[in-house]
């Protein structure tokens, strides 16, 4: 079994996997697509006159079941002799696992075929393919490998589980240069070229005036002074004619550099590790899709793009000088990659529902032209930005989009503008689909299969992050189709397979890339968990609930070492007060001008909570060192939303009659670099951030990080971005935080450059560290501070907002807006019980802050040093003992984080698995994020963290069961510190506890 988060790290496992794939390939030979390109002649194999069957001979049956065997040419001294042997034996030649062929019957035809094949173009890697035993075919005028000896099934599965190499050097590589290169590309491509910056790529389509596709392509910006446009191999000459015809009037040039540069697609979960092994372990690109990088691979220059045609969440396309192509290919094979041919490339892209020109673009099975908006990727590849002007096909595409929008609302009254769409299709009945087969709904012809075959997949067991990828594989009949636009996801249809109607369905997709590093097959018909409805006597359930609650409380509070940095345990006093009356009461209030801005409450019985809230504001002003505090928000996320809403309202204060303008550019920490989710366009910022009309993306720019320390901001690079974008709002703060934020330096710079902005610090994780041992944000120049009150701070789970505006400041009006956007804008009942508990937490924090904060910082540094000494890979700068906060980060290997975190939990050590700045997502997490604040409060000191570090090293590195020792260690630290132990307070708390029972 292979756990979902694991890579294959040793040669023995490679050998096992390889043997499994070979066995699967032998068992699952199948027939696939009969035609690759309707505008070209039938594809032909290099051996004899065998050719891909346009009649789909043997369609739907496995070759062994059809009584056929793969031709054997052992002992042949030449290629011609091998073909002759096959012919003399009377075998019908069958391409293993892909398409059936008929053997040549006449020697003259063999000679003619060999002469024709010798006239085909060859890539820089042709000799490498032949030496590896590849079966070569005519593909769009190129002699290309269709498969290698292991077969297409093996190649497909190896790509999905390890790493495969694809020769994509046959594709056209066009260099666009000159002063008007961007304007030209804006005119001939559907995408918004202005959205590209150096280091980025984009998918695009070359459109004709009718809104059909001349070709689809990828545009790369490796350098500031040129673009690289990569087009389909079979269309290169046609594309060049089209593009050069449109070049008139533009001061730029098009140069075909296909011969000078080779291209290799390196695809699969292990590809990043293999390529980084050639790059000295350095980052290839940013971990986002379409990111680019120029790197040195063992001294050879390479241009690396995080792109690909397999659907893999981890995949790169590498461009190298032609002279370096064979070296790179062979070097990657040495490291464990396997070569793969066009056959596997087709099954992989089909599983990913990626279009192939001449199948899902170009001419439809009925001879009509497929509109661009019939292809789902048009949503990303077509722009109507004003930046583009009147580009080729714009008018037709705008019409198509109008129909597309109607269909999204399920308005199919008029389908004339976009009658059909490309969609995935899956057979329910046993059989195999082929391109061109008709699709029916009842007696009505509703479309055609455009691509179809039998595709392998790995079976799994378990669910969620516990899903395990098994060695066993299965197969499923899937494909793509061109179908009536009013056919919806999950609709049932029938496919006419050689006169027999087979049941099929239109799924949403065939696979998902949302849980890297693996692409996950989505099998149609897998039952979702049933939605149960409670019934019967609830008394036993209530008893079970309280028993489990008691068990969980004892486990977390008495037996576990809790290291999740976003958590803390409130004191007994805070917990008791939070559960007391006025919990579940209401105390809505606001300032009323008619009463000289006095607070007016909407409910009676609120005098006590009124006093509590006023006292809490006073305590938090003292803690922050600021002028105003809002305590009614219920979380850090709500605090941020209230601030963003207020900033947007403040921006529009002069015009209440027009549509409100959203916030312009915001500068923040990217979520992959540790930024808060609540400060991202996908989070609390979502409804308040403008779309940049140039990039057509949210107007957000991210703080750059140091090349040698991705956890620390590169201040000088940040200053350049500040000067370029001049953001309206700057948001400091991270959830993966090892360093102080450079608030003072940025404040000084924006003031000097006269950048009118608002500086906000989201201190959710470090709110309890504000002070001389960490940072004083307002003293350093922050205007706004938001945060959560339950991480390093001592409070229950709430939010808070502080500002440093005075009544005569212009932005004091912003403060008043923040108040109104809190109530009634964000919250009605502001949870009075936890607000009461929060006042006690504020008393505790102000009383013990100095000793607590010093202990937290010292413990974090000591813990980091101990973890390192015990052999673990601690992230951060060793010059500062790896951290300046409560957090410590340990790298455990790409994709290993979830499993290691689960293993530690089984041993009563609760941590947070974390994706590092170089990783693609939480399922690919290769680190553990830990915080020392909670255990510091329970009395852990340097010696205790050192002992804990040793236990963790034993568990992580050696797989030792340390549960009993962890329980013993925790059992020695059950008394909370940094809280009041006054006898009178304890007596009253006992009385309160008795009343709460």
Predicted regions and their residues:
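N-terminal amphipathic/hydrophobic targeting modules at extreme N-termini
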Residues: 2-6, 37, 41, 67, ...
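N-terminal glycine-rich, Lys/His-bearing helix-loop that initiates the first secondary-structure elements
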Residues: 110-147, 525-615, 978-997
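Glycine-rich, small/acidic residue-mixed loop/short-helix segments
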Residues: 370-526
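Conserved small-domain helix->loop->beta segment predominantly found in fold-type I
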Residues: 410, 414-417, 842, 849, ...
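Conserved PLP-enzyme active-site core in the AAT-like
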Residues: 529-534, 608-611, 615-873, 932
């Amino acid at each position: 079994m292979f756990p979902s988060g694991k890579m294959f790290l040793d040669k023995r496992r490679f050998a096992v996997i390889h043997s499994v794939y070979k066995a699967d390939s032998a068992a699952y030979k199948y027939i696939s697509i009969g035609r690759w390109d309707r505008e070209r002649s039938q594809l032909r194999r290099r051996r004899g006159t065998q050719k891909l069957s346009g009649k789909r001979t043997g369609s739907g049956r496995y070759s062994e079941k059809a009584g056929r065997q793969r031709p054997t040419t052992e002992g042949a001294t030449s290629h011609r002799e091998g073909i002759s042997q096959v012919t003399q034996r009377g075998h019908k030649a069958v391409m293993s696992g892909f398409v059936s062929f008929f053997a040549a019957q006449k020697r003259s035809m063999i000679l003619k075929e060999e002469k024709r094949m010798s006239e085909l173009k060859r890539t820089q890697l042709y000799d490498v393919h032949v030496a590896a035993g590849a079966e070569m075919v005519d593909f769009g005028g190129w002699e290309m490998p269709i498969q290698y000896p292991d077969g297409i099934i093996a190649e497909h599965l190896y790509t999905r589980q390890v790493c495969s190499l694809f020769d994509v050097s046959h594709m056209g590589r066009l260099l666009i240069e000159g002063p008007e290169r961007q304007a030209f590309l804006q005119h001939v491509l559907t995408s918004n070229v202005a959205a590209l910056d150096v280091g980025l790529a984009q998918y695009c389509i070359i459109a004709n005036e009718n809104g059909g596709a001349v070709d689809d392509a990828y545009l790369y910006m490796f350098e500031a002074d040129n673009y690289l446009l990569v087009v389909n191999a079979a269309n290169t000459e046609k594309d060049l004619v089209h593009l050069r015809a449109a070049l008139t009037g533009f001061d730029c040039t098009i140069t075909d550099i296909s011969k000078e540069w080779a291209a290799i697609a390196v695809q699969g979960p292990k590809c990043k590790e293999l390529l980084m092994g050639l790059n000295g372990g350095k980052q290839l690109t940013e971990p986002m899709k379409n990111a680019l990088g120029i790197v040195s691979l063992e001294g050879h220059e390479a241009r690396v793009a995080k792109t690909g045609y397999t659907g893999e969440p981890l995949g790169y396309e590498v461009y190298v000088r032609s002279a370096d192509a064979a070296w790179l290919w062979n070097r990657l094979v040495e490291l464990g990659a396997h070569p793969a041919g066009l056959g596997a490339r087709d099954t992989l892209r089909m599983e990913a529902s990626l279009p192939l020109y001449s199948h899902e673009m170009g001419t439809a099975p009925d001879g009509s032209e497929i509109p661009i908006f019939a292809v789902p990727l048009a949503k990303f590849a077509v722009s109507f930005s004003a930046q583009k002007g009147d580009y080729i096909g714009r008018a037709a595409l705008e019409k198509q989009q109008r129909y597309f929008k109607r269909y999204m609302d399920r308005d199919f009254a008029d389908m004339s503008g976009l009658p059909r769409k490309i969609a995935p299709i899956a057979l329910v009945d046993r059989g195999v689909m082929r391109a061109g087969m008709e699709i029916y709904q009842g007696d009505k012809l509703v479309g055609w299969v455009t691509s179809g075959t039998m595709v392998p997949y790995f079976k799994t067991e378990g669910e969620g992050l516990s899903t395990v990828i098994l060695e066993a594989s299965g197969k499923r009949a899937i494909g793509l189709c061109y179908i009536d636009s009013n056919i919806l996801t999950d609709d049932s249809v029938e496919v006419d397979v050689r006169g027999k109607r087979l049941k099929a369905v239109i799924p949403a997709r065939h696979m998902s890339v949302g849980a890297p590093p693996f692409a996950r097959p989505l099998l149609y018909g897998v039952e979702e968990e049933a939605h149960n409805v409670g019934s019967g006597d609830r008394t036993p359930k209530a008893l079970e609930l309280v028993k489990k609650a008691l068990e969980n409380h004892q486990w977390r509070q008495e037996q576990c070492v809790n290291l999740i940095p976003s958590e803390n345990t409130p004191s007994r006093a805070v917990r008791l007060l939070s559960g007391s009356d006025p919990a579940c009461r209401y105390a809505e209030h606001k300032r009323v001008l008619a009463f000289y801005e006095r607070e007016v409450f909407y409910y009676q019985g609120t005098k006590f909570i009124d006093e509590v809230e006023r006292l809490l504001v006073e305590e938090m002003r003292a803690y922050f060192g600021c002028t105003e505090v809002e305590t009614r928000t219920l979380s850090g996320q709500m605090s941020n939303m209230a601030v963003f809403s207020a900033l947007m309202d403040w921006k529009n204060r002069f015009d209440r009659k027009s549509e409100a303008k959203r916030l312009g550019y915001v500068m923040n920490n990217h979520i992959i670099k540790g930024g808060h989710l609540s400060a991202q366009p996908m989070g609390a910022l979502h409804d308040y951030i403008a779309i940049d009309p140039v990039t057509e993306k949210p107007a957000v720019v991210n703080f750059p990080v140091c090349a040698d320390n991705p956890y620390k901001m590169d201040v000088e690079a940040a200053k350049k971005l500040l000067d370029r974008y001049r953001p309206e709002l700057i948001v400091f703060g991270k959830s993966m935080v090892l360093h102080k934020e450079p608030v003072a330096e940025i404040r000084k710079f924006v003031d000097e450059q006269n950048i009118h902005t608002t500086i906000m610090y989201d201190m959710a994780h470090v709110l309890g560290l504000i002070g001389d041992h960490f940072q004083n944000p307002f003293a350093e120049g922050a205007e706004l501070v938001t945060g959560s009150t339950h991480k390093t701070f001592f409070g229950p789970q709430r939010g808070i907002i502080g500002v440093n505006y005075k009544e005569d400041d212009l932005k004091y009006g912003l403060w008043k807006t923040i108040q109104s956007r809190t109530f009634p804008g964000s919250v009605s009942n502001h949870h009075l019980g936890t607000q009461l508990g929060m006042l006690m937490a504020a008393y505790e924090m102000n009383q013990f802050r100095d000793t607590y904060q010093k202990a937290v910082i010292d413990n974090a540094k000591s813990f980091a040093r101990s973890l390192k000494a015990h052999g673990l890979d601690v992230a951060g700068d060793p010059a500062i003992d790896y951290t300046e906060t409560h957090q410590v980060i340990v790298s455990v290997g790409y994709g290993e984080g979830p499993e290691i975190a689960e293993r530690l939990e089984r041993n009563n050590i609760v941590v947070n698995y974390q994706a590092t700045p170089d990783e693609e997502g939480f399922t690919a997490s290769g680190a553990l994020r830990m915080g020392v604040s909670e255990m510091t409060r329970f009395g852990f000191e340097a010696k205790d963290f050192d002992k804990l570090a040793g236990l963790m090293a034993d568990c992580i590195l050696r797989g030792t069961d340390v549960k009993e020792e962890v329980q013993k260690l925790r059992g020695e630290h059950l008394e909370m510190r940094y809280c009041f132990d006054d006898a009178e307070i304890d007596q009253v708390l006992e009385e309160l506890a008795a009343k709460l029972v």
